[in-house]
C-alpha cells in the first residue's frame, strides 16, 4: 500500500484549452477517494493520468515516495478496474485472474496462491472453472476485481465499474466494495457520475466540474457545507433549492425577483443590498400552520412511498419540499413552509462561491 499525491497536475490536448485545471491532491495510505461529476468534467481523464494512460501536461504524480509521472502503467504499481469487464471469453475465471501474473513471469504455485486468496475474498471459489458467458454481470465484475487484487497493487483505480449493472445489483456491489476495502485497506481512487456511489463509498469526495475540483471533503462536509453553487446543485437528490434574490438594506429580508420576501431570522446587515443565492435542501423545509410560514401554491405532488415531494414556485423560481409519507396535500392547495435558519446556505450569485454569515 502507498499514499498517492498529485502536485499541480494539468492536462491540455491542444496546449490552449485546459481539460484539467491545476489540481493538488493528497490521498492517504489506505484511503478510499471518489471523484464524482457529470460527463465531460475531467474525472476519467484525471484517473487515466494517474494510471499512465494519459500524460500530464504539467505537474507531477507520486505513488508512495516514487515520482511516477513519466513511468509506463505497468511500472506504477497500480491495478485498474474498468466499466466493461474486459474478460477473455475463451478463458475460465481462474485463467482470467491469473493471466496478468503469467505474463509477468510468476511461478505456478505463487499464481495459484494469489488467485485462491482473491477468489476466497470475493467468494468466487465455486466459479473458478466457469467461462465468462456462464456468469452474471455481478460475478463478472467480481472477476475483474479479482484480476486487480492478485496484482497486489499499491493503488486501486476504478473507472465507473458499476455502470453496466442494474439498480439492484449496483446496491449489492456497493456493499461488496465497502467490505472489500475494509479487508484490503488498499489506497483507492474511484470515478463515478453517480452521487449515491460517491456518498456511500467514499472516505472523501472530489466533486469535479469542467476540469476543476470544486470541493474535496468528506461526504458529510460536501452535503452539509457545499463550497459552491455547482456542488449544492449536484449533490443531493432532489437537488438543493437555489433561489436568486437580493438582501434588504437592513439584512433582515431576502427579496426574490418578483418581490416575494423571505424573512431572515438571523439578520445579516453586512450583506445589505447584495445579490445572493439562497439555498436550502428539500428535506430541511418544514410545513407549518404558523403565521411565520411562507405560502407556496402546490403545483404537483410526487408520491415516493417513504416520503412525498411537493413542487411549487416562489418568486417565479422552482421550490421542492420533502414531506412525510402521511402528508398528501392536493395540487392547487397552499402550503405554509418554514425555513429553519440553521439550514440556510448562501452563495455569491456572480462567483458561485459559498459565503459564511
UniProtKB/Swiss-Prot annotation:
It comes from the Bacteria. SMART domains: AAA. Pfam families: ABC_tran, OB_MalK. ATP binds at residues 37-44. The keyword DNA damage does not apply. Its EC number is 7.6.2.10. It is a peripheral membrane protein. Residues 4-235 form the ABC transporter domain. PROSITE patterns: ABC_TRANSPORTER_1, ABC_TRANSPORTER_2, UGPC. Keywords: ATP-binding, Cell inner membrane, Cell membrane, Membrane, Nucleotide-binding, Sugar transport, Translocase, Transport. One of its GO terms (molecular function) is ABC-type glycerol-3-phosphate transporter activity. GO terms for cellular component: ATP-binding cassette (ABC) transporter complex, substrate-binding subunit-containing. It is found in: Cell inner membrane. One of its GO terms (biological process) is carbohydrate transport. It catalyses: sn-glycerol 3-phosphate(out) + ATP + H2O = sn-glycerol 3-phosphate(in) + ADP + phosphate + H(+). CDD domains: ABC_MalK_N. The complex is composed of two ATP-binding proteins (UgpC), two transmembrane proteins (UgpA and UgpE) and a solute-binding protein (UgpB). Belongs to the ABC transporter superfamily. sn-glycerol-3-phosphate importer (TC 3.A.1.1.3) family. NCBIfam families: PRK11650.1. Part of the ABC transporter complex UgpBAEC involved in sn-glycerol-3-phosphate (G3P) import. Responsible for energy coupling to the transport system. This is sn-glycerol-3-phosphate import ATP-binding protein UgpC. It comes from Yersinia pseudotuberculosis serotype I (strain IP32953). The lineage of its organism: Bacteria, Pseudomonadati, Pseudomonadota, Gammaproteobacteria, Enterobacterales. The gene is ugpC.
Amino acid at each position: 500500500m502507498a499514499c498517492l499525491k498529485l502536485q499541480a497536475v494539468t492536462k491540455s490536448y491542444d496546449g490552449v484549452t485546459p481539460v484539467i485545471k491545476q489540481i493538488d491532491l493528497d490521498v492517504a495510505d489506505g484511503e478510499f477517494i471518489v471523484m464524482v461529476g457529470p460527463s465531460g468534467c475531467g474525472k476519467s481523464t484525471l484517473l487515466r493520468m494517474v494510471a499512465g494512460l494519459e500524460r500530464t501536461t504539467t505537474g507531477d504524480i507520486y505513488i508512495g515516495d516514487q515520482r511516477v509521472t513519466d513511468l509506463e502503467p505497468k511500472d506504477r504499481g497500480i491495478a485498474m478496474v474498468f466499466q466493461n469487464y474486459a474478460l477473455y471469453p475463451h478463458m475460465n475465471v481462474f485463467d482470467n485472474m491469473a493471466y496478468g501474473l503469467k505474463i509477468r513471469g510468476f511461478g505456478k504455485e505463487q499464481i495459484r496462491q494469489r488467485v485462491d486468496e482473491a477468489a476466497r475474498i470475493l467468494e468466487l471459489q465455486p466459479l473458478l472453472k466457469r467461462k465468462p458467458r456462464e456468469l452474471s454481470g455481478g460475478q463478472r465484475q467480481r472477476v475483474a476485481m479479482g484480476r486487480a487484487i492478485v496484482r497486489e497493487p499499491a493503488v486501486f483505480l476504478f473507472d465507473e465499474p458499476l455502470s453496466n449493472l442494474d439498480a439492484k445489483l449496483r446496491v449489492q456491489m456497493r456493499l461488496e466494495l465497502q467490505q472489500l476495502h475494509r479487508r484490503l485497506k488498499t489506497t483507492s481512487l474511484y470515478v463515478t457520475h453517480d452521487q449515491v456511489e460517491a456518498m456511500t463509498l467514499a472516505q472523501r469526495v472530489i466533486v469535479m466540474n469542467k476540469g476543476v475540483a470544486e470541493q474535496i471533503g468528506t461526504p458529510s462536509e460536501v452535503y452539509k457545507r457545499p463550497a459552491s453553487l455547482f456542488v449544492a446543485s449536484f449533490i443531493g437528490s432532489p437537488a438543493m433549492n437555489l433561489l436568486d434574490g437580493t438582501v434588504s438594506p437592513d439584512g433582515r429580508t431576502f427579496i426574490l425577483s418578483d418581490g416575494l420576501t423571505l424573512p431572515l431570522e438571523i439578520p445579516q446587515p453586512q450583506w445589505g443590498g447584495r445579490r445572493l443565492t439562497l439555498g436550502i435542501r428539500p428535506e430541511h423545509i418544514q410545513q407549518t400552520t404558523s403565521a411565520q410560514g411562507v405560502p407556496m401554491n402546490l403545483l404537483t405532488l410526487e408520491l415516493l412511498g417513504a416520503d412525498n415531494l411537493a413542487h411549487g414556485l416562489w418568486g417565479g423560481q422552482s421550490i421542492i419540499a420533502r414531506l412525510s409519507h402521511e402528508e398528501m396535500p392536493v395540487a392547487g392547495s397552499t402550503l405554509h413552509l418554514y425555513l429553519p435558519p440553521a439550514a440556510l446556505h448562501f452563495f455569491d450569485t456572480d462567483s458561485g462561491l459559498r459565503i459564511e454569515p
